[in-house]
């Protein structure tokens, strides 16, 4: 009777058994992945962790007519489950009292009165009478209750639109969103779950001198930017508008909402890769101390030694101290004998088959279609190419390339005929660089703005025609530029000059890739979507369930980037040519960012490399048929769109249902007005008034987070791990006749080339970085996969997701088939590197393939 009274009524009480899967705090310690989980901490948990079910059908007048709570149930014995659990997880039994009136539980409250936090993965009620199994996907850290201002609540895996939420659960749904939003004040702590916005005012460190001051990005017309996650750290002493920074040694502790932090396997992999790369970086440095030219590679053999010979492990007290300080798990990883030992970098794909094919014109051009930055090339639509820069400020910036420069290489066509036949293309790095070039060249960088013209040959490959290199006029910006045009040559010093011209282009493309294609267009633009989704869409919302996997680890990797990569004096500034102007440049480029244009078909049409064509499979027809990124990308895009269409159509049948969804409307409003607030007045934002607008927007969000990021990230080491192929910096200008540099170029062209591009120190640092960024961690979740098979209770979306997975498997087979087709010369090229960057799945490590669900590295 007492129990009956507790849960409402005097009916016979029954027992409902459940299984709780959790992980204790120090099971996640990367130094002890295999640690036993049945230790005293968990033994003590039993009576210190309580669960209370919340009824979705029986109200409690004493609780404001919200769902009735069951009496508390506590963790019981350790269970041996039939399904194997992941490393570090443990299952426990829990038994609830239940009666008929209580009905179906829609949520539960958990209270942790233990001193430690733990990771709660799931609760499954095995057999609720008249209902069967009820599953709660949790995947959340639960801290001691005194850390929270409100109860920790988890909902069952049945999605509901706001208007369809059971009445007794609505207040819980609303309150949980209020908790996640916070009140916009205070410094965030490790246990907080609050999602909020801030500008990029934390890149500089003005307290450490003028050289460490950086412009705030976001919140101004001059430097607009997507918002980042708010940490609430106090301002710097010298500038109240700049946020103070945490010490480098505490970088891993930078605030992100607790459940956004890397999981234990990822953190272990990440730290191991970082340590491994650092050691690889340090050892050649020690070696270079005994070299006559310590910051120079003297020959290409010198560069190749990084991958082939390696350096013998030094013995002695220093090495012993180093190994003693490294945890055992890490030592096993560092000293593996599978060709990736600590003493050398893995051989990048671009030089695996041939050590020299990267230098060919064909490979130079092919990488614009199938390399790590295949999203810049566009069709030439006016000749000579014109600039869009303001002539009042920058004078005449139009190209000086003439028909005489290129017509002898157009297979008998005139320039007009070649353009009309869609045969001329351009890699244009002129307008984006000119406003900053004068300042960039005051640093150790010495480089040019560039335009590269290419001709589409009958065999489907591209041929470089001319490279224009431009410098700001010495008398001032308003006088325009001084330009010089270079054309291909394979004879004598002209051949060496042509190789250098291509290197300057590669430097530009490398910087634009890292700052724009990679950081801005994937990492930075997606973070506001992560924040808004958690603030405005309940975990019960179907669109939250759709998008959630595509936000995994993004806030954490971006926070770490702000701490050690893109900050003043960080690794990015140290390794890319724009140096301290890098992030400011990306803000200027963000002015032209258009959300609907991030959709792959729209992007291809905008760049002129495709035309709209309703009779083509994906609604567009490629003008370069053998364009590996676009061909594979359109297949992936269509698969994502088909899946999103099936999913959204299940929940929304009319415009009215979209318009009356208050969470969805609040989400979209906040994204436009706050998350991407510097662009809130742009006319191109979808209104979010129709199911089609929702489908298109969600498809684009998923595309950016998954396939676009994979295409521009995981090819970094395969193509740029060998720095001569994609140098990040140029240190001197093109040699002029009559100078010692020109004589050196004639006598020792390789040495002159290496003295022009990235120096040894920068190379080692840059290669170390991109090796880390190009690796998949062992716990990666790929497109078409989910963390839990129980992510939703709705059968139709589950079936649609299964169909999506099968479609991606078919696409993998097609990619393998295309890569084996010798007619498609751009698929592998002279370096024999098959295009696999949009191959959906991968194993862990440095694979050059695989599309993770999210921007997770």
Curated annotation (Swiss-Prot):
Plant lipoxygenases may be involved in a number of diverse aspects of plant physiology including growth and development, pest resistance, and senescence or responses to wounding. Catalyzes the hydroperoxidation of lipids containing a cis,cis-1,4-pentadiene structure. Linoleic and linolenic acids are the preferred substrates, but is also active with arachidonic acid. The products are almost exclusively the S enantiomers. Gene3D superfamilies: 3.10.450.60, Lipoxygenase-1, Domain 2, Lipoxygenase-1, Domain 3, Lipoxygenase-1, Domain 5, PLAT/LH2 domain. It holds the Pfam family Lipoxygenase. It is found in: Cytoplasm. Its EC number is 1.13.11.58. Keywords: Cytoplasm, Dioxygenase, Fatty acid biosynthesis, Fatty acid metabolism, Iron, Lipid biosynthesis, Lipid metabolism, Metal-binding, Oxidoreductase, Oxylipin biosynthesis. Monomer. Optimum pH is 5.5-7.0. It catalyses: (9Z,12Z)-octadecadienoate + O2 = (9S)-hydroperoxy-(10E,12Z)-octadecadienoate. Its cofactor is Fe cation. Pathway: Lipid metabolism; oxylipin biosynthesis. One of its GO terms (biological process) is fatty acid biosynthetic process. Signal peptide: none annotated. One of its GO terms (cellular component) is cytoplasm. Induction: Up-regulated in stored tubers 8 hours after wounding and by jasmonate. Down-regulated in growing tubers containing already high levels of LOX1.5 at the time of wounding. The keyword Transmembrane does not apply. This is Linoleate 9S-lipoxygenase 6. Binds 1 Fe cation per subunit. Iron is tightly bound. Fe cation binds at residues 518, 523, 709, 713, 857. Residues 208-218 have a biased composition (Polar residues). Residues 159-857 form the Lipoxygenase domain. The gene is LOX1.6.
């Amino acid at each position: 009777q007492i129990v009956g009274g507790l849960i409402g009524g005097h009916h016979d009480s029954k027992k409902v058994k459940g299984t709780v899967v959790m992980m204790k705090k120090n099971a996640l310690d990367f130094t002890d992945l295999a640690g036993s989980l049945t230790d005293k901490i968990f033994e003590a948990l039993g009576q210190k962790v309580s669960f209370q079910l919340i009824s979705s059908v029986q109200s409690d007048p004493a609780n404001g007519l919200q769902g009735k709570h069951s009496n508390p149930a506590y963790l019981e014995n350790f269970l041996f489950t039939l399904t194997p659990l992941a490393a570090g997880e443990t299952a426990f039994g829990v038994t609830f009292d239940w009666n008929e009136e209580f009905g179906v539980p829609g949520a539960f409250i958990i209270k942790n009165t233990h001193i430690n936090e733990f990771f709660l993965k799931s609760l499954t009620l095995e057999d609720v009478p008249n209902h069967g199994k009820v599953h709660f996907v949790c995947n959340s850290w639960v801290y001691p209750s005194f850390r929270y201002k409100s109860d920790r609540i988890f909902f069952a895996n049945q999605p509901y639109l706001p208007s369809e939420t059971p009445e007794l659960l609505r207040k819980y749904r609303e309150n949980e969103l209020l908790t996640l939003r916070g009140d916009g004040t205070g410094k965030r702590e490790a246990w907080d779950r609050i999602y909020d916005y801030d500008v990029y005012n934390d890149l500089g460190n003005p307290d450490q001198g003028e050289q460490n001051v950086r412009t705030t990005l976001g919140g101004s017309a001059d430097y607009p930017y997507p918002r980042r996650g708010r940490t609430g750290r106090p301002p710097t002493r010298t500038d109240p508008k700049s946020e103070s920074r945490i010490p480098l040694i505490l970088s891993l502790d930078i605030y992100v909402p607790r459940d956004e932090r890397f999981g234990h396997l990822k953190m272990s992999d990440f730290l191991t890769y970082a340590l491994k790369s650092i050691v690889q970086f340090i050892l050649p440095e020690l070696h270079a101390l005994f070299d006559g030219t310590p910051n120079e590679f003297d020959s290409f053999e010198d560069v190749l030694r990084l991958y082939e010979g390696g350096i013998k492990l030094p013995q002695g007290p220093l090495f012993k101290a180093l190994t003693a300080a490294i945890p055992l798990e890490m030592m096993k990883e560092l000293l593996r004998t599978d060709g990736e030992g600590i003493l050398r970098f893995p051989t990048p794909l671009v030089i695996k088959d041939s050590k020299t094919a990267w230098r060919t014109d064909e490979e130079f051009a092919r990488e614009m279609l199938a390399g790590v930055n295949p999203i810049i090339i566009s069709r030439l639509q006016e000749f000579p190419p014109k600039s869009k820069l303001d002539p009042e400020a920058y004078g005449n910036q139009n190209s000086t390339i003439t028909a005489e420069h290129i017509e002898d290489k157009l297979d008998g066509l005139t320039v007009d005929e070649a353009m009309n036949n869609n045969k001329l293309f351009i890699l244009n790095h002129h307008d984006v660089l000119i406003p900053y070039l004068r300042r960039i060249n005051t640093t150790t960088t010495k480089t040019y703005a560039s335009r590269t013209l290419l001709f589409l040959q009958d065999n489907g490959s591209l041929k470089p025609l001319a490279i224009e290199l431009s410098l700001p006029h010495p008398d001032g910006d308003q006088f325009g530029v001084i330009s010089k045009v270079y054309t291909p040559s394979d004879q004598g010093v002209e051949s060496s000059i042509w190789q250098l011209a291509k290197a300057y282009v590669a430097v530009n493309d490398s910087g634009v890739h890292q700052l724009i294609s990679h950081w801005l267009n994937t990492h930075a633009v997606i973070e506001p979507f992560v924040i808004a989704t958690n603030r405005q869409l309940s975990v019960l919302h179907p669109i939250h369930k759709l998008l959630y996997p595509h936000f995994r680890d993004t806030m954490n990797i971006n926070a770490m980037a702000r701490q050690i990569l893109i900050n003043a004096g960080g690794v990015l500034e140290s390794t890319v040519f724009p140096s301290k102007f890098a992030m400011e440049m990306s803000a200027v480029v963000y002015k032209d960012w258009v959300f609907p244009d991030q959709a792959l078909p729209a992007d291809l049409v905008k760049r002129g490399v495709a035309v709209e064509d309703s009779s083509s499979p994906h609604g567009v027809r490629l003008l370069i048929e053998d364009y590996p990124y676009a061909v594979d990308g359109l297949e992936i895009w269509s698969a994502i769109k088909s899946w999103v269409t099936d999913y959204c159509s299940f929940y929304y049948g009319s415009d009215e249902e979209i318009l009356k969804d208050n969470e969805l409307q609040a989400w979209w409003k906040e994204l436009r007005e706050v998350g991407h607030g510097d662009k809130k007045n742009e006319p191109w934002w979808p209104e979010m008034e129709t199911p089609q607008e929702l489908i298109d927007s969600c498809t684009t969000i998923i595309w950016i987070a998954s396939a676009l990021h994979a295409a521009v990230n995981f090819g970094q080491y395969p193509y740029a791990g060998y720095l001569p192929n994609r140098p990040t910096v140029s240190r001197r200008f093109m040699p002029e006749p009559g100078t010692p540099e020109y004589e050196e170029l004639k006598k020792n062209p390789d040495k002159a080339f290496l003295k022009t591009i990235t120096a040894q120190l920068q190379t080692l640092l840059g290669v170390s970085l991109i090796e880390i960024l190009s690796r998949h961690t062992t716990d990666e979740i790929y497109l078409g996969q989910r963390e839990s098979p129980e992510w939703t209770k709705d059968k139709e979306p589950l079936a649609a997701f299964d169909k999506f997975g099968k479609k991606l498997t078919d696409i993998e087979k097609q990619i393998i088939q295309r890569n084996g087709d010798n007619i498609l010369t751009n698929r592998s090229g002279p370096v024999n590197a098959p295009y696999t960057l949009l191959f959906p799945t991968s194993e862990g490590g440095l694979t050059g393939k695989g599309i993770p669900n999210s921007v997770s590295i």
